[in-house]
Structure formats: C-alpha cells, structure tokens
C-alpha cells in the first residue's frame, strides 16, 4: 500500500462560495431575460411593420404571387371581297402552352415532349424566339396545331408537367391561297423588328397574349383595324399555377372586318388565264380607281407563313427563278414602251409642241439633229406621212422621237410624273416600287454622267431609263379616261362597324388641270383607232367584239440593239425576249373597266397581251357584270352570305 497517496487523499469537499454562485446565476438570468425581451421586441416590431406600417405593400406582393393578370387576345377581323365572299378567316386550333419560369428542368421537359406530342426542332426554335421577346411568367405557345392523338397523349402524361396546358387559339386561314396572296399578304410571328416598332409606336401592350401580326399586303396595311383590342382576366391561382377563380375581367374587342374592292370571281378567272405564264393583270374601275382584280403569276400559298414557314419551303420559294414571292403588278418595273404614247400626246398638245394635225414624214427611222445617229422605228419601211391620230393608231416611233426631242426631258418627265410615273400609286400595299421616270438630276446622281439628247429620244417611246409597274400604267390610263382627274388606286371598299365606313380617297396627288379638253379627246381617239381602225395594231385581237374598246399596245425591249443589229428571237434566250404590254378601257363611251396586261418575255404586245386583255373584257362585260347587276347585292356585314351573294360568286 502507498501510504503517501493514502494520507494525501482529501476526506471532504472543498469550501464553496454560495453567495457568489447566486449572484452569478442572477446576472446570467438577467442577461438571458434581457436578450429574450430584446428579441421579443424586435419580433413584435417586425410584426408591427409587416401588419400595420407596410401592410399594403406586402399584401400587394402576396396577391401578386396568387393573383395574375391574363391577357385575352382579340379575334382578328375577317376579310371579304366586294360581294361578301370570305377571303380570310380564323380557324380554331389547339396548342400546348408552357410557362418556362415554372418548369423545373426545361431542357429535359422539351426533350420528353418530343415523344409525347411530337415536338420538333422548328417548334423549339420558334419557342425560344418567343421566349426572348415575351414577358416572364406568361404562357408561350410551344406546340401549335395539336392533333387529337397528341392531345390525348398529353392528357395521360400532363400531371407530370404542371407548367404546361393545352389551350384553344385562333389561326389565320386564307381560303384562296395563291389567287389572293399578293393582295392579302399574310400574318406571321412577330420578330424583334416588329416588337421594336410596336414599342416605339406605344402599341406593344395591345399584343399581349398574341404572337401574330400582319406582315405583308392588306394584312399589314390595315393591321390596326384588323387586330382589335386585347382584354384581360384577373385570376387567382394556386401554388401550381392553376387558375382557381376569376376575380374580374375586361373582354377583348374583336378586330373590324373589312370588305375589299376585289371581285373574287374575276380574280380567279384571270389567275386561270395566266396559269403557266410570268406576268400581271390589273383591272380598275375608272370611276374611282378601285381595284377589281390584280393578279401576279406565279404566286405562292400564303398559308405557309402563318405558323412560321419552314426553312426548306422558304429556300424553295427564294430560289425559284420565276420569283413567286415577287408581285409583278406592284413591284415589277418594266420599260412601259408604247403604252405611254397617248399620255405623251396629251402633254405635247398642252405644251403647244404639236396639234392633232401636226404631220411628219416617217421613213422608218429618225435622225438626231446635227448627228448621224439613227433611231429606228419598229416598222422598217416607216409609216409615211403621219399625224397624231395615225401615230397613236400605228404606234409610230419616229413621230414620238420628234415629239420627245421638241419637248425636252424636263417638260416630258414633269408631265409623266403628273400621270403617276416615278412614284408610288398610293395603293394600300407597301410592297410597291416607284419605278423610275428619268431626269437630268437622276442620271447625274446614278451614273455620274450628264444627260444627253439621245437619252430623251428613247424616253419618247417608253424605253431607255424609263420603267413603270403595271399598276402605274393602269392608273395613268384611268387619268386619261377621266380627262386628268386623279383617283388613288385602292383595295378598301368599306370597314364594318356599327355603321359601315366607306373608303375615302386620301387625295394624295393633284388632278391634271389643262384647259385643252381636245388634247384628251385626241389621245383617246387614237387609242380607239388602235383597236377599231383597219391599220390599228390591236384590231385583230378585238375583231367582232360586241362592245367598243380603246387601247394601246407596247413591246418593251429587254436589251438595246446596236444601230444596224437585227432582232432575232430564235437566237435569244427566253429571258431576253421582249415584254408584251396592252392597256385598254371599255366600253369606249361609258368606261366600266381599265385592263392593263404585262407578259414577261412574251414578244409583241398586240399579238400576245391584247388577246388576253380581250378575254378579260369579254368575261367581265358579257358575263360577270350582267350577273352582278341582276342580283345587285350590297356588301354583306355578316359572315353567312345571302343566297344571292352565293350565286354571284358562282357557287
């Protein structure tokens, strides 16, 4: 045994200071109590701030998490022809909508939906574009045009995707596709430029809940009328984003429907006539320049663009050498050729350059004064002694070379601008070129070269630097018919509403005021003889017509010949052949239509374009117009047409 360890082990507890321990405990208790009191004070202060001071703020935030404002897109206005025939409608489809911000794994979800609803790469690409432009927590169309099978498959699997929902939506549909494409244009998905423009014009809010906007044609020009006004629903949602109840709403206001001046039956008839050809036909009512028909071929199906055209289809249209996307009626710029001789005749008489009796000898060419340069007439042997009437009737180039030389380019170009050349016509289609009426300033700016007299001579027969669209030639013809009265070519007949709103001419351009009424009559008499005189260039095409016609042919050269070079069509590529023109009006004493025809690379105007114009006039004056006048149907303001309207439209 270790005695030292035994004796050193204490046998009792050390002394404790009870008072000190009590004081320490009291201090700790006080600190703890003060801490609890402080924290309780902070807690109640925050509760006071939340419940009393900032009650409105946090209530708004709370409501924002469970109350949403859902846009109600309006139904787009319909489009009818002049007799109430439906041209553009809205069809109901079902689409799969997604709220990306409420989707846990977006990439995985998109991948899984490929198998459930047939989601394609194109669908995903369109969705991503819309997401970049859209507002957060707003449903975005992911998969359009769902089939019944796809809807059923999603119904089975939908519980896995609380942020997705199948909803109905309206989709634009064009009933006559290629026949009306260049007039109606189409609606398509908004792009960044559209969004920027809408925001700049303070219209973007009205497009909440819709991705469609008018892109071309009438759909674009009358977008504000057709679009309507977006409504809204204030709804309460649960934690899964599902609507529990609707708190209040403001219904959307549907877009207004519009009636065009187009006669669908005439439009379809002309489309059939132009089948397989490259060209255009414009038909105007000379009383007010309303467009009865405007056809450009080849054309395209505008329904392809509504949901976003596929890259394959778009490449096919772009690479088509026949250029189906290009409206030859409003964008085709061709030398107007001899169709302009009657207009020049009016100008030259008014400027006292010629009178109806002014006569020159036409040997088949014209020589520029103080020069050896010859300008050839289309008729190699010439026309002999030629006055104004004969010059128009036989289309003497030599006569109008002399007229152009005497007038000079300044007066000539100014007058042709009065007839509407070198500027937009004012029609409600933005896809229109101004073409070109040349001036000294234009050539200097374009080619850095001064104007020379030889340039003026070519302009005198509608060649050289002068280009025009078929619509411009048709407009100029109506101005001639009306002795200088200028009406704007237009496609709008009326807008539906509480009261039908008829079209009002914006009067973009002034009338041609000339005291010489005889100048107009002399030009029109020449056009009458083109078709009716034995020596008229268009006589053959209108032989035995049961109505009186006045017209003018034109043959537009695609390239210039050298002085002694002969024109040989057999050795030329098709695209180098002349363009065929013909513009006419009928009946002569009481005009009811103006018809202008251009056929690309078809050859002479009198032998190719004039017969087609004859068919159009025969159909309209002998068949269509009597049918319309018999029923005399007013514009229909309802979608379901009357029996008479159905009969008028050939159904």
From Swiss-Prot:
Name of one Pfam family that matches: PBP_dimer
Catalytic activity, as annotated: Preferential cleavage: (Ac)2-L-Lys-D-Ala-|-D-Ala. Also transpeptidation of peptidyl-alanyl moieties that are N-acyl substituents of D-alanine
Domain of life of the native organism: Bacteria
Active-site residues per Swiss-Prot or TrEMBL entry: 338 (acyl-ester intermediate)
Functional summary from the UniProt entry: Catalyzes cross-linking of the peptidoglycan cell wall.
NCBIfam families, sorted: pbp2_mrdA
Full protein name: Peptidoglycan D,D-transpeptidase MrdA
Species annotation: Haemophilus influenzae (strain ATCC 51907 / DSM 11121 / KW20 / Rd)
């Amino acid at each position: 045994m270790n005695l030292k360890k035994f004796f050193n082990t204490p046998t009792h507890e050390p002394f404790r200071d009870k008072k000190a321990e009590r004081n320490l405990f009291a201090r700790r208790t006080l600190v703890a109590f003060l801490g609890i009191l402080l924290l309780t004070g902070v807690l109640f202060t925050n509760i006071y701030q939340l419940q009393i001071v900032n009650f409105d703020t946090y209530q708004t935030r709370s409501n924002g998490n469970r109350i949403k404002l859902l846009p109600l897109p309006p139904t787009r206005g319909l489009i009818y022809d002049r007799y109430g025939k439906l041209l553009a409608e809205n069809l109901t489809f079902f689409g799969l909508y997604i709220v990306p911000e409420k989707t846990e794994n977006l990439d995985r979800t998109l991948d899984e939906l490929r198998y459930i609803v047939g989601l394609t790469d194109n669908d995903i690409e369109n969705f991503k574009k819309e997401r970049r432009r859209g507002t957060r927590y707003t449903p975005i169309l992911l998969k359009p045009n769902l089939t019944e099978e796809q809807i059923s498959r999603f119904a089975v699997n939908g519980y896995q995707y609380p942020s997705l929902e199948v909803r109905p939506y309206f989709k634009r549909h064009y009933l006559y596709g290629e026949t009306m494409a260049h007039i109606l244009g189409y609606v398509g998905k908004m792009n960044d430029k559209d969004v920027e423009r809408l925001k700049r014009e303070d219209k973007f809010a009205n497009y909440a809940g819709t991705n469609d906007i008018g892109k071309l044609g009438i759909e674009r020009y009358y977008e504000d009328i057709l679009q309507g006004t977006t409504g809204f629903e204030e709804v309460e949602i649960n934690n899964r984003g599902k609507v529990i109840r609707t708190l209040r709403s403001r219904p959307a206001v549907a877009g207004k429907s519009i009636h065009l001046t187009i006669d669908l039956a005439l439009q379809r008839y002309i489309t059939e006539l132009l089948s397989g050809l490259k060209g255009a036909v414009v038909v105007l009512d000379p009383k007010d320049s309303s467009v009865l028909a405007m056809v450009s071929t080849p054309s395209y199906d505008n329904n392809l663009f509504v949901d976003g055209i596929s890259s394959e289809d778009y490449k096919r249209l772009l690479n088509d050498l026949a250029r189906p996307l290009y409206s030859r009626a409003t964008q085709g710029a061709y030398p107007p050729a001899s169709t302009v001789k009657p207009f020049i005749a009016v100008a030259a008489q008014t400027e006292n350059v010629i009178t109806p009796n002014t006569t020159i000898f036409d040997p088949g060419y014209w020589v520029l004064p103080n020069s050896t340069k010859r300008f050839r007439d289309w008729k190699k042997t010439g026309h002999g002694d030629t006055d104004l009437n004969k010059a128009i009737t036989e289309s003497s180039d030599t006569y109008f070379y002399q007229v152009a030389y005497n007038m000079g380019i300044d007066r000539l170009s100014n007058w042709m601008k009065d007839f509407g050349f070198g500027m937009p016509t004012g029609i409600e289609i933005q896809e229109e070129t101004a073409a070109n009426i040349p001036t000294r300033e234009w050539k200097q700016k374009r080619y850095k070269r001064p104007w020379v007299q030889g340039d003026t001579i070519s302009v005198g027969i509608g060649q050289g630097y002068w280009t025009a669209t078929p619509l411009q030639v048709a407009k100029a013809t109506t101005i001639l018919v009306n002795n200088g009265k200028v009406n704007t070519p237009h496609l709008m007949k009326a807008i539906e509403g509480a009261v039908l709103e008829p079209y009002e001419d914006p009067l973009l351009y002034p009338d041609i005021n000339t005291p010489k009424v005889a100048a107009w009559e002399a030009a029109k008499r020449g056009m009458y003889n083109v078709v009716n005189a034995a020596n008229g260039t268009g006589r053959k095409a209108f032989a035995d017509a049961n109505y009186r016609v006045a017209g003018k042919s034109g043959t537009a050269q695609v390239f210039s010949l050298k002085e002694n070079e002969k024109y040989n069509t057999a050795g030329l590529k098709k695209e180098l052949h002349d363009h065929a023109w013909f513009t006419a009006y009928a009946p002569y004493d009481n005009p009811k239509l103006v018809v202008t025809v251009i056929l690309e690379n078809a050859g002479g105007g009198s032998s190719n374009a004039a017969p087609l114009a004859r068919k159009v006039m025969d159909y309209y004056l002998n068949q269509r117009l009597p049918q319309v006048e018999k029923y005399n149907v007013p514009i229909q303001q309802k979608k379901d047409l009357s029996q008479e309207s159905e009969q008028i439209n050939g159904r």
